[in-house]
Every structure is written in structure tokens, then in C-alpha cells.
Regions:
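C-terminal helical subdomain
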Residues: 146, 162-197
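Substrate-binding pocket helix/loop in short-chain dehydrogenase/reductase
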Residues: 62-73
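Residue(s) in the substrate-gating loop at a strand-loop-helix junction
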Residues: 106
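Active-site helix of classical SDR
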Residues: 86, 122
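Rossmann-fold cofactor-recognition segment
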Residues: 17-32
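Conserved NAD(P)H cofactor-binding loop of Rossmann-fold oxidoreductase domains
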Residues: 54-59
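Conserved glycine-rich Rossmann-like NAD(P)H-binding loop of the short-chain dehydrogenase/reductase
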Residues: 1-13
């Protein structure tokens, strides 16, 4: 297994404590670095079956008042960072004519949520991108999977100042993703189901009903 992230110390900690895991430090906003790191991974592993791309930052404080620098940063990391990574591997999988590209989006991409405009926009863009990529890669027998988690307890969600329904642990998320990728054949892996089904219902509601429900439910957020 090859893993990449910006924090080299954490990567090394993981790779040293688990046999068969190799770390490759990477900032996904650097498109050329994405290509060079993937070339290093190819050289090491020779044959790659699946690539999972998960990038995400969020700053709820800045989202309560429009901060253009933060909006650009969130889009640059969450959306363009993922696209940079996918761009680095696409030709490999097309030529291989098999394999799987998995994109971690979020249920926040289903509809706009309070105090999360840039984050929702970045994840909505990823969801649409994954749907479009599905058709392109299917012609080459390459599978594309969209992963849409609900609230997962991480340092990022620790910033939120509102109750997060049905929040789950990273271990739960990892198990759901693993089972979905290995044992199921669906385009989208979404979890926890009890929460994501509610979000999918909200997704198809008329705007006036959706806004009324969200406005009532999010009163605890201060602007």
C-alpha cells in the first residue's frame, strides 16, 4: 500500500508501524508533484489496482463571513487537489484497461449547508466530476467509485460548533469504505446509511421545504 499526505512525520509513523505500507509525501495542489509521486509509486509497485483520493479542508469560522482567500484555498485543495491527483493516474489506468479510481466526496455535496458554502461547493464539484469521469473511464473498463461519508470525527469536524447527527469514528469509515470497494459493485459508497438516506431525501425536496427544515434545524449556528 502506498500512502500520501502533506504531513511527512505522520506518514512515516504509519509506514514504520505497519509492514507493507510505504509513504510518499505530497501536496496535492502541486500538479507536477502529483505526477512525479505517482511515477515513483509505479516504479515501486509495478502494477496498481486501485487509487483512493481523499482531500479535504474546511474553515467554518471563515465561511460565516465570506473570505475569498479561504474560499479559493478550500476549492484549490478539495477540488483541484483531487483533480490533480486523478490527472496523474488517468492515462495509466486507461492504458491498463482495468483498475479502480475512488473519489472521497461528502454528503455535504448533496446540497448547500449553512456555514459551509465553499466546502459544500467543493464536494458538489467533486461529485459531479466523479459522475462525468465514470462515463469516460467505463469505455476503458476502469471503474470509478464515489465515496460520500456523513460526519466523521476528525480534527476537521472538531471545528464545528453545532451538533453533528450520527457522527462516526474514522475506524467505522475505513471499514465502510473497505467493504464498499472490495465486496460491492455500486458507483456510490455512502454511510452511515441512516443519515445518508435522510440527506438523499433532502436532496430531492423542493427548495422552500428544504430551506425551512434547515433553517429550523440549524438555529444553534451563530453568524
Amino acid at each position: 500500500v502506498a500512502i500520501s499526505a502533506r504531513r511527512e512525520n505522520l506518514l512515516n509513523e504509519i509506514s514504520k508501524s505497519h509492514d507493507g505500507i510505504f509513504s510518499y509525501p505530497l501536496d496535492v495542489t502541486d500538479s507536477e508533484k502529483c505526477k512525479s509521486v505517482f511515477n515513483d509509486i509505479k516504479e515501486k509497485f509495478k502494477d496498481i489496482d486501485i487509487s483512493v483520493f481523499s482531500t479535504g479542508i474546511h474553515d467554518p469560522k471563515s465561511e460565516k463571513s465570506l473570505n475569498l482567500d479561504k474560499v479559493r484555498q478550500i476549492m484549490e485543495v478539495n477540488f483541484f487537489g483531487t483533480v490533480n491527483s486523478i490527472n496523474a493516474v488517468c492515462d495509466y489506468y486507461k492504458n491498463r484497461k482495468s483498475g479502480q479510481i475512488s473519489i472521497v466526496s461528502s454528503v455535504a455535496g448533496y446540497r448547500g449547508l449553512p456555514a459551509a458554502g465553499a466546502y459544500c461547493a467543493s464536494k458538489s464539484a467533486l461529485t459531479s466530476f466523479a459522475e462525468s469521469l465514470y462515463f469516460e473511464m467505463k469505455r476503458k473498463d476502469v471503474k470509478v467509485t464515489l465515496i460520500s461519508p456523513g460526519f466523521i470525527k476528525t480534527p476537521m469536524t472538531d471545528q464545528n460548533d453545532f451538533p453533528m447527527p450520527m457522527i462516526k469514528s474514522p475506524e467505522f469509515a475505513a471499514e465502510q469504505i473497505y467493504v464498499g470497494l472490495v465486496k460491492k459493485n455500486a458507483f456510490e459508497i455512502h454511510f452511515p446509511k441512516s443519515f445518508t438516506f435522510i440527506m438523499k431525501i433532502l436532496q430531492i425536496l423542493p427548495n422552500w421545504i428544504y430551506f425551512k427544515i434547515l433553517d429550523k434545524g440549524m438555529k444553534k449556528i451563530s453568524y
